[in-house]
């Protein structure tokens, strides 16, 4: 994975003609909680100059191009984040940025970076290219954090009513644990660590589902694919909803 991060940062810098303020990582990679099959490689890249239309078009499908060139590499497709101009990021007003997400990618002039990402960047962001200073990432205020937790809670209530046989279904349990930790301590931690904390502090009334979710998440990287194909696991996942 480290080699893939280096290759990706080099490619982004090259497309931007080296006019890169910096690239920062956050999320599971920074928390040493990256789990293949569960996790993304979250990043933000900020340029020193305006991104041209040609550069944006070249950056748009960079993940796919690198994946096609190295079909056995599972990491390039997992990069998620934005590539934008630093000044525009600070003003929260964009003329053009490139967004890579789970469901696709796009060139846009409008994007709201979620509170949890901003929180992680401000406190735990790791520079991997260019500027070493994370002070440009402002820590969200308590009201913003409370609002984000409430919004995420509503999302869970909406989409976890009917779970499916994917591992993401039990991932909701870890999200809940993480949100409760954030409310209590005004901080962010890794999903696995949040699950362990919730068990140790008996946060959940019924701890059995969380224990099983942690068992799956903590399995070696080659094991999740086995869990995905097991009928008992798939049945359990689909029955997790209320």
Model-derived features: where do they sit?
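Residues that form or immediately flank small-molecule/cofactor binding pockets and catalytic motifs
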Residues: 28, 83-88, 215-218
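Conserved NTP/Mg2+-binding pocket subregion across the NTase superfamily
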Residues: 56, 61-166, 179
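Catalytic metal-binding acidic patch
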Residues: 25-65, 78-81
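Conserved nucleotidyltransferase catalytic core and NTase-mimicking acidic/glycine-rich helix/loop elements
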Residues: 120-242
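Helical scaffold of the NTase/Pol beta-like nucleotidyltransferase catalytic core
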Residues: 1-24, 54-57, 242
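Short helix-terminating capping/connector loops at secondary-structure junctions
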Residues: 17-19, 37, 72-77
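Generic structural marker for isolated residues within well-ordered, non-membrane alpha-helices
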Residues: 9, 117, 195
């Amino acid at each position: 994975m480290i080699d893939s991060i280096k290759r990706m940062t080099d490619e982004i810098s090259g497309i931007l003609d080296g006019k890169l303020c910096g690239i920062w990582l956050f999320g599971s990679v920074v928390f040493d909680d990256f789990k293949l099959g569960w996790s993304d490689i979250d990043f933000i890249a900020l340029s020193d100059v305006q991104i041209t239309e040609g550069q944006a078009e070249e950056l748009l499908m960079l993940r796919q191009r690198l994946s096609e060139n190295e079909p056995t590499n599972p990491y390039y497709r997992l990069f998620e984040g934005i590539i934008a101009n630093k000044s525009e990021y600070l003003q929260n007003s964009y003329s053009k940025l490139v967004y890579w997400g789970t469901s696709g990618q796009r060139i846009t002039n409008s994007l709201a970076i979620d509170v949890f990402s901003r929180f992680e960047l401000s406190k735990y962001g790791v520079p991997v290219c260019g500027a070493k200073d994370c002070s440009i990432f402002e820590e969200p205020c308590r009201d913003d954090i409370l609002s984000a937790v409430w919004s995420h809670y509503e999302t869970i209530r909406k989409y976890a009513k009917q779970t499916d046989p994917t591992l993401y279904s039990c991932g909701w349990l870890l999200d809940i644990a993480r949100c409760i930790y954030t409310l209590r301590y005004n901080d962010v931690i890794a999903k696995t660590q949040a699950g362990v904390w919730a068990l140790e502090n008996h946060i959940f009334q019924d701890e059995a589902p969380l224990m099983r979710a942690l068992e799956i998440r903590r399995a070696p990287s080659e094991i999740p694919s086995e869990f995905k194909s097991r009928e008992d696991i798939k049945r359990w996942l689909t029955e997790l909803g209320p």
